[in-house]
Structure formats: C-alpha cells, structure tokens
Swiss-Prot record:
Residues bound to substrate: 12, 34, 61-70, 116, 177, 186, 207
Pathway per the UniProt entry: Pyrimidine metabolism; UMP biosynthesis via de novo pathway; UMP from orotate: step 2/2
Gene: pyrF
Family: Belongs to the OMP decarboxylase family. Type 1 subfamily.
Subunit structure: Homodimer.
GO biological process: 'de novo' pyrimidine nucleobase biosynthetic process; 'de novo' UMP biosynthetic process
Domain of life: Bacteria
Cross-referenced CDD domains: OMP_decarboxylase_like (cd04725)
Catalysed conversion reaction: orotidine 5'-phosphate + H(+) = UMP + CO2
Keyword Methyltransferase: no
Classification via PANTHER family: OROTIDINE 5'-PHOSPHATE DECARBOXYLASE
Record carries keyword Protein biosynthesis: no
Its job: Catalyzes the decarboxylation of orotidine 5'-monophosphate (OMP) to uridine 5'-monophosphate (UMP).
Protein name per the record: Orotidine 5'-phosphate decarboxylase
Amino acid sequence: MTARDRLIVGLDVPNLQEAEKVVSALGDDILYYKIGYQLAFAGGLEFARDLAKDGKKIFLDMKLLDIDNTVASGVENIVKMGMSMLTLHAYPKAMKAAVAAAKGSDLCLLGVTVLTSMDEEDLIAAGYEYDPHTLVLRRAEQALLAGMGGIVCSAEEASAVRKIIGPDMALVTPGIRPAGSDKGDQKRVMTPAEGIRAGSSHLVVARPIVKAADPREAARAILAEMDAAL
C-alpha cells in the first residue's frame, strides 16, 4: 500500500458545508475519509454514501456497543451503505455479533481498544484495573479471537499490538500529529513517520489537515513523510 492508501482524513467538522469544502480542497490526493458522530448527525451519513459512490473509501467511526442483536442489525444496514471501515468497542460479544452480521461483505470491522484521549488516570476513574497498554493488548487479543478485521489503538501501543494480531489485520492509529503541531485533546500521540514505523497500517489525521490554511498542502506534507517511512 502507498501512503495514499494508508492516510485517513478525519472530517471532524460541524456541518456538511465544511466537510464538502475540505473534500473539494483535497481532491484526488486523498482516498480515505473518516466520518464520526459530529458529522454523521448533521447529514453526514448520506454524504458518506455519496463519497463512496464517487470512489472514496469511508471509515464510519460509530464505536458501536449494545446488545448483540442491536449491534448485528446496525452492522447489516451499514454493510448496505458501501462503507469500507466501521468501529465498535472491543467487547467480545459485540464483536462476535458484528463479525457474523458482516460475513461475506467487504466491510472491515475495527475494534476500538482504548481512546487516545485517555491515560491511566482516566481508566482508574472509570473503574478499570488495567493501565492503557495492558488493556489495549488484552482487547487486541479478544478482537483477534472474534475474527475482527482490525484494531484501533494509539501509535504508542501499535508495535506491541502488531505482534499479537500478526501482519494481516488492519491497525488504525488516531492521535497522529506532525512534529510541532498542537496535541489538542489527545494524550498518546506520535508523528506520521513514527506511526508507520510502529506498524500501523492506517493513520487518522484530522485537525492538522482540516484546520490548516491550505489543507491540500498539509496533506501532501504528511503523505510525503509517510512515504519516506514506508
């Protein structure tokens, strides 16, 4: 895969007008886009369908978690939308239900391990007994056993996760920031080159591109850094 196949631009913008502006600015340079709650609930699901019809790949970041039947029903409908990736929290029963519902489709199911905005203090406050690294590895093992298509984790854990899941599963890393850029609300971050060298198959970059004065120039700089690390 080239850097263009690996870079996912997060459309973390408040409305369709902003999303359309970003996609237009990036043109053919970008293949993959991530759409999460913010845009999905502002007309973004139909926009996702349209982008997919235009040949773009869409990572639908819904982080599903519910009873088995509800998760399965949701996944069945998302398969019909033509999405390329879908996230759900890496809980064994939910993952197994999703895998069964997506069987035979091209949808890559991704297990979310620990949010990159969380550190050990946050996990303790939420009632977990594991530090982020340990919990990520445990959930990676569970995702592998469930038959998931990939894992979402920070670049800090990517190398260790890759050893668990092997070379074939997708390893998607958010919290990627070019050197010198603002971390924002992310706590466990790495540069694009570091993410690639750590074993990530795909990198998610949002603010450093969508908030840049020249999004295409920002994206091209990140693509060049990734290509150099491949």
